[in-house]
Amino acid sequence: MKLLKYGLVIVAVLLILILTRFTYNLRDRHPEFNIDLVIDPPAEPGELFVGFAKMPITPQVTDTWNDFNGNARYEPEQGETYNDVNGNNKFDPIWIAGFHNRRPAQGVHDDLWARVMVIDDGATRVAIASIDAVGFIYDDAVDIRKSAHGKINCDYTIISSTHVHQAPDLIGIWGESFFKSGVNTEYMHYVKRQTVAAIETAVKNLVPVKLRIGQDLEGAIPYVVDSRDPQEMDPGIRIIQAIEIRSGKTLGSLVSWSNHPETLWSKNLLISSDFPHYFRESVENGVHKGDRLLAQGLGGITVFVNGAVGGLMTTN
Protein backbone atom coordinates (compact mmCIF):
# COMPACT_ATOMS: atom_id res chain seq x y z
CA MET A 1 0.00 0.00 0.00
CA LYS A 2 2.83 2.40 0.86
CA LEU A 3 4.49 1.73 -2.48
CA LEU A 4 1.21 2.51 -4.22
CA LYS A 5 0.90 5.79 -2.33
CA TYR A 6 4.48 6.74 -3.12
CA GLY A 7 3.88 5.85 -6.75
CA LEU A 8 0.75 8.00 -6.92
CA VAL A 9 2.59 10.91 -5.30
CA ILE A 10 5.40 10.65 -7.85
CA VAL A 11 2.90 10.52 -10.73
CA ALA A 12 1.05 13.53 -9.31
CA VAL A 13 4.28 15.52 -8.98
CA LEU A 14 5.26 14.66 -12.54
CA LEU A 15 1.85 15.73 -13.83
CA ILE A 16 2.11 19.03 -11.95
CA LEU A 17 5.57 19.66 -13.41
CA ILE A 18 4.36 18.84 -16.92
CA LEU A 19 1.30 21.09 -16.57
CA THR A 20 3.46 23.89 -15.15
CA ARG A 21 5.88 23.65 -18.08
CA PHE A 22 2.97 23.48 -20.53
CA THR A 23 1.31 26.55 -19.01
CA TYR A 24 4.60 28.43 -18.97
CA ASN A 25 5.22 27.72 -22.64
CA LEU A 26 1.70 28.89 -23.54
CA ARG A 27 2.06 32.22 -21.76
CA ASP A 28 1.70 35.46 -23.69
CA ARG A 29 5.20 36.94 -23.86
CA HIS A 30 3.81 40.26 -25.12
CA PRO A 31 0.64 41.01 -23.11
CA GLU A 32 1.01 44.73 -23.82
CA PHE A 33 1.19 44.27 -27.60
CA ASN A 34 -1.85 44.88 -29.77
CA ILE A 35 -2.54 45.68 -33.40
CA ASP A 36 -4.77 48.51 -34.59
CA LEU A 37 -5.81 47.73 -38.15
CA VAL A 38 -8.09 50.75 -38.50
CA ILE A 39 -6.43 52.62 -41.36
CA ASP A 40 -7.65 55.96 -42.64
CA PRO A 41 -6.94 56.17 -46.38
CA PRO A 42 -5.45 59.34 -47.84
CA ALA A 43 -7.98 61.94 -48.92
CA GLU A 44 -6.53 61.91 -52.44
CA PRO A 45 -4.56 59.21 -54.27
CA GLY A 46 -0.87 59.95 -54.23
CA GLU A 47 2.46 58.39 -54.97
CA LEU A 48 3.17 54.83 -53.89
CA PHE A 49 6.61 54.09 -52.47
CA VAL A 50 8.15 50.61 -52.39
CA GLY A 51 11.49 49.30 -51.17
CA PHE A 52 13.11 45.86 -51.22
CA ALA A 53 15.95 44.23 -49.29
CA LYS A 54 17.32 40.81 -48.39
CA MET A 55 19.59 39.53 -45.63
CA PRO A 56 21.10 36.03 -45.33
CA ILE A 57 19.94 33.84 -42.45
CA THR A 58 22.04 30.80 -43.32
CA PRO A 59 23.22 28.97 -40.18
CA GLN A 60 26.82 28.01 -39.59
CA VAL A 61 27.03 24.23 -39.57
CA THR A 62 30.04 23.20 -37.50
CA ASP A 63 29.77 19.67 -36.14
CA THR A 64 28.87 16.88 -38.56
CA TRP A 65 27.94 13.26 -37.85
CA ASN A 66 28.20 9.75 -39.25
CA ASP A 67 24.93 8.33 -40.56
CA PHE A 68 26.01 4.70 -40.65
CA ASN A 69 22.59 3.26 -41.56
CA GLY A 70 21.65 6.02 -44.01
CA ASN A 71 18.25 6.82 -42.51
CA ALA A 72 18.99 10.53 -41.88
CA ARG A 73 18.35 10.11 -38.14
CA TYR A 74 21.08 10.70 -35.57
CA GLU A 75 21.01 7.54 -33.42
CA PRO A 76 23.92 7.38 -30.97
CA GLU A 77 22.25 4.41 -29.30
CA GLN A 78 22.88 2.56 -32.59
CA GLY A 79 26.57 3.44 -32.50
CA GLU A 80 26.41 6.57 -34.64
CA THR A 81 28.98 9.23 -33.77
CA TYR A 82 29.53 12.93 -34.29
CA ASN A 83 32.59 14.82 -35.53
CA ASP A 84 33.64 17.45 -32.99
CA VAL A 85 34.76 20.00 -35.58
CA ASN A 86 34.86 22.93 -33.15
CA GLY A 87 36.65 20.88 -30.49
CA ASN A 88 34.38 21.68 -27.53
CA ASN A 89 33.80 18.01 -26.63
CA LYS A 90 30.07 18.07 -27.34
CA PHE A 91 27.74 17.70 -30.33
CA ASP A 92 26.48 21.07 -31.62
CA PRO A 93 23.83 20.09 -34.18
CA ILE A 94 21.65 22.27 -36.38
CA TRP A 95 18.37 20.36 -36.34
CA ILE A 96 16.54 20.46 -39.68
CA ALA A 97 12.79 21.05 -39.40
CA GLY A 98 10.14 19.09 -41.25
CA PHE A 99 9.51 15.38 -41.80
CA HIS A 100 11.01 13.82 -38.64
CA ASN A 101 13.17 14.35 -35.55
CA ARG A 102 16.89 13.69 -35.19
CA ARG A 103 17.94 15.18 -38.56
CA PRO A 104 21.10 17.27 -37.97
CA ALA A 105 22.47 19.23 -40.93
CA GLN A 106 25.70 18.07 -42.56
CA GLY A 107 26.34 21.28 -44.52
CA VAL A 108 24.77 23.98 -46.70
CA HIS A 109 23.43 23.51 -50.24
CA ASP A 110 22.24 27.09 -50.80
CA ASP A 111 21.65 30.15 -48.64
CA LEU A 112 18.57 30.94 -46.57
CA TRP A 113 17.16 34.47 -46.66
CA ALA A 114 15.02 37.06 -44.96
CA ARG A 115 13.52 39.00 -47.88
CA VAL A 116 11.38 42.09 -47.47
CA MET A 117 9.06 44.30 -49.49
CA VAL A 118 7.93 47.55 -47.83
CA ILE A 119 4.93 49.47 -49.20
CA ASP A 120 4.19 53.08 -48.19
CA ASP A 121 1.38 55.25 -49.55
CA GLY A 122 2.30 58.26 -47.45
CA ALA A 123 -0.22 57.40 -44.75
CA THR A 124 0.46 53.74 -43.95
CA ARG A 125 3.67 51.72 -44.06
CA VAL A 126 3.49 47.92 -44.36
CA ALA A 127 6.42 45.50 -44.40
CA ILE A 128 6.06 42.03 -45.92
CA ALA A 129 8.89 39.83 -44.65
CA SER A 130 9.41 36.30 -45.93
CA ILE A 131 11.90 34.02 -44.19
CA ASP A 132 13.18 30.63 -45.31
CA ALA A 133 11.82 28.59 -42.40
CA VAL A 134 9.25 25.88 -41.77
CA GLY A 135 7.30 28.29 -39.57
CA PHE A 136 7.56 31.09 -37.05
CA ILE A 137 5.78 31.28 -33.67
CA TYR A 138 3.55 34.31 -32.99
CA ASP A 139 5.57 35.56 -30.00
CA ASP A 140 8.75 35.53 -32.09
CA ALA A 141 6.98 37.39 -34.89
CA VAL A 142 5.90 40.02 -32.37
CA ASP A 143 9.56 40.54 -31.39
CA ILE A 144 10.23 41.56 -35.00
CA ARG A 145 7.05 43.64 -35.27
CA LYS A 146 7.88 45.62 -32.15
CA SER A 147 11.39 46.34 -33.40
CA ALA A 148 10.13 47.36 -36.83
CA HIS A 149 7.48 49.64 -35.36
CA GLY A 150 9.80 51.23 -32.84
CA LYS A 151 12.83 51.75 -35.09
CA ILE A 152 11.32 52.56 -38.47
CA ASN A 153 7.65 53.27 -37.81
CA CYS A 154 6.14 50.34 -39.70
CA ASP A 155 2.40 50.36 -39.05
CA TYR A 156 2.18 46.64 -39.67
CA THR A 157 4.73 43.91 -40.35
CA ILE A 158 3.68 40.63 -41.93
CA ILE A 159 6.01 37.72 -41.15
CA SER A 160 5.65 34.88 -43.64
CA SER A 161 7.55 31.59 -43.68
CA THR A 162 8.22 29.78 -46.95
CA HIS A 163 7.52 26.54 -45.01
CA VAL A 164 10.71 24.97 -46.35
CA HIS A 165 11.46 21.52 -44.91
CA GLN A 166 15.25 21.88 -45.18
CA ALA A 167 15.95 24.79 -42.78
CA PRO A 168 16.70 24.92 -39.03
CA ASP A 169 13.92 24.25 -36.56
CA LEU A 170 12.39 27.55 -35.40
CA ILE A 171 9.25 25.96 -33.93
CA GLY A 172 10.76 23.55 -31.41
CA ILE A 173 9.34 20.17 -32.44
CA TRP A 174 12.12 18.77 -34.65
CA GLY A 175 14.94 18.35 -32.16
CA GLU A 176 16.69 15.32 -30.75
CA SER A 177 13.38 13.86 -29.59
CA PHE A 178 9.71 14.75 -29.23
CA PHE A 179 10.54 16.09 -25.77
CA LYS A 180 13.52 18.28 -26.72
CA SER A 181 13.29 21.49 -28.71
CA GLY A 182 15.34 21.78 -31.87
CA VAL A 183 15.56 25.58 -31.67
CA ASN A 184 19.07 27.00 -31.43
CA THR A 185 18.66 30.18 -29.37
CA GLU A 186 21.62 31.98 -30.93
CA TYR A 187 20.34 31.20 -34.42
CA MET A 188 16.85 32.41 -33.52
CA HIS A 189 18.29 35.75 -32.37
CA TYR A 190 20.28 35.94 -35.60
CA VAL A 191 17.16 35.39 -37.72
CA LYS A 192 15.32 38.14 -35.86
CA ARG A 193 18.22 40.60 -36.17
CA GLN A 194 18.65 39.92 -39.87
CA THR A 195 14.93 40.22 -40.56
CA VAL A 196 14.75 43.58 -38.77
CA ALA A 197 17.87 44.69 -40.66
CA ALA A 198 16.22 43.72 -43.95
CA ILE A 199 13.12 45.74 -43.04
CA GLU A 200 15.25 48.75 -42.11
CA THR A 201 17.16 48.52 -45.39
CA ALA A 202 13.95 48.17 -47.42
CA VAL A 203 12.62 51.34 -45.78
CA LYS A 204 15.81 53.18 -46.72
CA ASN A 205 15.29 51.97 -50.29
CA LEU A 206 11.75 53.39 -50.61
CA VAL A 207 11.21 55.16 -53.95
CA PRO A 208 8.14 56.07 -56.06
CA VAL A 209 6.96 53.11 -58.13
CA LYS A 210 4.28 51.79 -60.38
CA LEU A 211 3.02 48.24 -59.88
CA ARG A 212 2.33 45.57 -62.48
CA ILE A 213 0.21 42.65 -61.34
CA GLY A 214 -0.11 39.34 -63.17
CA GLN A 215 -1.22 35.77 -62.64
CA ASP A 216 -1.07 32.40 -64.37
CA LEU A 217 -3.77 30.13 -62.99
CA GLU A 218 -3.05 27.06 -65.13
CA GLY A 219 0.61 26.93 -66.20
CA ALA A 220 1.85 25.35 -62.96
CA ILE A 221 -0.85 22.67 -62.71
CA PRO A 222 1.57 19.87 -63.79
CA TYR A 223 3.94 20.74 -60.95
CA VAL A 224 1.63 20.52 -57.93
CA VAL A 225 -0.42 17.62 -56.62
CA ASP A 226 -2.78 17.17 -53.68
CA SER A 227 -1.53 14.07 -51.89
CA ARG A 228 -4.78 13.63 -49.96
CA ASP A 229 -8.38 13.32 -51.07
CA PRO A 230 -10.42 15.31 -51.85
CA GLN A 231 -8.31 16.88 -54.58
CA GLU A 232 -8.42 20.59 -53.77
CA MET A 233 -5.62 22.97 -54.71
CA ASP A 234 -4.75 26.44 -55.90
CA PRO A 235 -2.09 26.02 -58.62
CA GLY A 236 -2.01 29.69 -59.60
CA ILE A 237 1.20 31.73 -59.69
CA ARG A 238 0.74 35.41 -58.84
CA ILE A 239 3.21 38.28 -59.06
CA ILE A 240 3.41 41.97 -58.19
CA GLN A 241 6.29 43.71 -59.97
CA ALA A 242 7.49 47.07 -58.61
CA ILE A 243 9.02 49.35 -61.25
CA GLU A 244 10.84 52.53 -60.26
CA ILE A 245 9.16 55.47 -61.98
CA ARG A 246 12.35 57.49 -62.46
CA SER A 247 14.55 54.80 -64.02
CA GLY A 248 12.00 52.30 -65.31
CA LYS A 249 13.97 49.48 -63.67
CA THR A 250 12.47 46.64 -61.66
CA LEU A 251 13.15 47.10 -57.95
CA GLY A 252 11.74 43.71 -57.06
CA SER A 253 8.78 41.38 -57.18
CA LEU A 254 6.42 39.71 -54.73
CA VAL A 255 5.54 36.24 -56.01
CA SER A 256 3.29 33.54 -54.60
CA TRP A 257 2.64 29.87 -55.33
CA SER A 258 0.93 27.30 -53.11
CA ASN A 259 3.25 24.33 -52.71
CA HIS A 260 5.35 22.54 -50.08
CA PRO A 261 9.10 23.30 -50.46
CA GLU A 262 10.11 19.68 -49.85
CA THR A 263 11.53 18.48 -53.16
CA LEU A 264 14.76 17.31 -51.47
CA TRP A 265 12.63 15.10 -49.20
CA SER A 266 13.26 13.53 -45.82
CA LYS A 267 16.80 12.16 -46.20
CA ASN A 268 18.37 15.43 -47.28
CA LEU A 269 20.98 16.61 -44.76
CA LEU A 270 21.97 19.92 -46.37
CA ILE A 271 20.51 23.31 -45.46
CA SER A 272 18.50 24.64 -48.41
CA SER A 273 15.62 26.94 -49.28
CA ASP A 274 14.48 24.21 -51.71
CA PHE A 275 12.50 25.27 -54.80
CA PRO A 276 11.95 28.90 -53.64
CA HIS A 277 15.70 29.36 -54.25
CA TYR A 278 15.33 28.50 -57.94
CA PHE A 279 11.98 30.28 -58.19
CA ARG A 280 13.54 33.52 -56.96
CA GLU A 281 16.69 33.10 -59.05
CA SER A 282 14.59 32.57 -62.18
CA VAL A 283 12.40 35.62 -61.61
CA GLU A 284 15.45 37.77 -60.92
CA ASN A 285 17.98 36.43 -63.44
CA GLY A 286 15.97 34.45 -65.97
CA VAL A 287 15.49 30.77 -66.77
CA HIS A 288 18.58 29.08 -68.16
CA LYS A 289 19.28 25.67 -69.66
CA GLY A 290 23.02 25.31 -69.74
CA ASP A 291 24.33 28.40 -71.52
CA ARG A 292 20.98 29.07 -73.21
CA LEU A 293 18.56 31.70 -71.86
CA LEU A 294 15.00 30.38 -72.06
CA ALA A 295 13.23 33.32 -70.41
CA GLN A 296 14.35 36.80 -69.45
CA GLY A 297 14.43 37.69 -65.75
CA LEU A 298 12.83 40.79 -64.29
CA GLY A 299 15.79 41.85 -62.14
CA GLY A 300 15.63 43.28 -58.64
CA ILE A 301 14.92 41.30 -55.48
CA THR A 302 12.26 38.60 -55.46
CA VAL A 303 10.23 37.93 -52.30
CA PHE A 304 8.51 34.53 -52.36
CA VAL A 305 5.47 33.95 -50.15
CA ASN A 306 3.70 30.62 -49.94
CA GLY A 307 -0.03 30.10 -50.28
CA ALA A 308 -2.55 27.46 -49.21
CA VAL A 309 -0.40 24.33 -48.87
CA GLY A 310 -2.15 22.37 -46.12
CA GLY A 311 -4.12 19.37 -47.15
CA LEU A 312 -1.48 18.49 -48.62
CA MET A 313 -0.06 20.25 -51.69
CA THR A 314 3.36 19.00 -52.73
CA THR A 315 5.60 19.14 -55.78
CA ASN A 316 4.82 16.75 -58.62
Question: What role is predicted for each listed range?
Answer:
Residues L4-V9, L17-N316:
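Conserved beta-alpha junction segments in alpha/beta enzyme cores
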